[in-house]
């Protein structure tokens, strides 16, 4: 059985992206999401809470809850992703599950959404009370090229930095690195939290800078690179020579 080829064209929503983490009908928090540039838009991490005005927060919360009502998703954990465009919030996706940033939420507010979800499932009363209010940021690490990972280190140095909640590597030396333009490209992450947005940003950057690696291009890429260097004509500045 063969189907005729079809193309799906979707509008690109220009603007910062946010994610509302929800339990039942309560918006727990809203994060600001970071993505790599086109064409893949690989997710790079997020910050809780997002730097929003009261009106922006209220608008995103209202739109998110209206999505749940429209879809009949009033029970358990959900997360709604939106982009804030010139005409206001545009919904990107609605997910009837816990989001992937439960650790970041716990670092920011002291709320363990996994535990609270289990309480809901077994019939106990959940508790979404915020035990503290910090700025928490997660940053995912992505390699800059394909090839064989020669070495990678610095996770212990990063983890020892005050304010770093966790620093973890997913790969080991001699691992083949082939970027696919999605979540499978991640080789590690760092998570940090502090009472200050500027301080958290500085801690995360220091932790990321502490983690280093070396990747040797695959043999074919090495040959192509050498050939391109040999065949490239020398450029003579205008007016000289």
Q: What function would you assign to each model-found segment?
A:
Residues 56, 74, 105-110, 131:
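Alpha-helix N-cap/loop-to-helix boundary motif
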Residues 38-42, 101-105, 160-162, 212-215:
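A short, polar/proline- and glycine-enriched secondary-structure boundary/capping micro-motif
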Residues 59-62, 112-113, 134:
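Generic recognition of short, well-ordered alpha-helical interface segments
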Residues 52, 105-109, 192-195, 199:
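Short alpha-helix boundary/capping segments
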Residues 118-241:
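Peripheral (often C-terminal) accessory segments that flank ATP-dependent C-N-forming ligase machineries
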Residues 103-119:
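Gly/Ser/Thr-rich active-site loops/lids in small-molecule metabolic enzymes
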Residues 1-7, 11-50, 58-90, 95-102, ...:
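Phosphate-binding core of ATP-grasp and ATP-grasp-like enzymes
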């Amino acid at each position: 059985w063969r189907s005729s080829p079809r193309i799906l064209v979707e509008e690109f929503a220009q603007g910062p992206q946010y994610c509302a983490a929800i339990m039942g009908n309560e918006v727990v928090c809203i994060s600001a999401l970071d993505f790599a540039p086109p064409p893949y838009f690989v997710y790079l991490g997020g910050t809780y809470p997002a730097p929003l005005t009261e009106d922006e927060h209220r608008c995103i919360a209202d739109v998110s809850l209206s999505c749940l009502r429209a879809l009949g998703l009033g029970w358990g954990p959900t997360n709604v992703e939106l982009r804030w465009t010139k005409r206001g919030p545009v919904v990107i996706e609605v997910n009837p599950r816990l989001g992937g940033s439960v650790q970041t939420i716990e670092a920011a507010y002291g709320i363990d959404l996994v535990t609270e979800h289990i309480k809901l499932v077994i019939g106990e009363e959940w508790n979404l009370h915020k035990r503290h209010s910090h700025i928490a940021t997660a940053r995912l690490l992505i390699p800059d090229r394909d090839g064989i990972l020669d070495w990678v280190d610095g996770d212990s140095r990063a983890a020892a930095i005050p304010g770093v909640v966790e620093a973890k590597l997913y790969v080991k030396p001699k691992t083949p690195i082939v970027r696919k333009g999605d979540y499978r490209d991640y080789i590690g992450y760092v998570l940090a939290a502090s009472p200050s947005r500027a301080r958290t940003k500085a801690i995360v950057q220091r932790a990321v800078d502490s983690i280093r690696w070396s990747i040797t291009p695959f043999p074919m890429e090495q040959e192509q690179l050498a050939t391109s260097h040999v065949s490239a004509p020398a450029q003579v500045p205008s007016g000289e020579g």
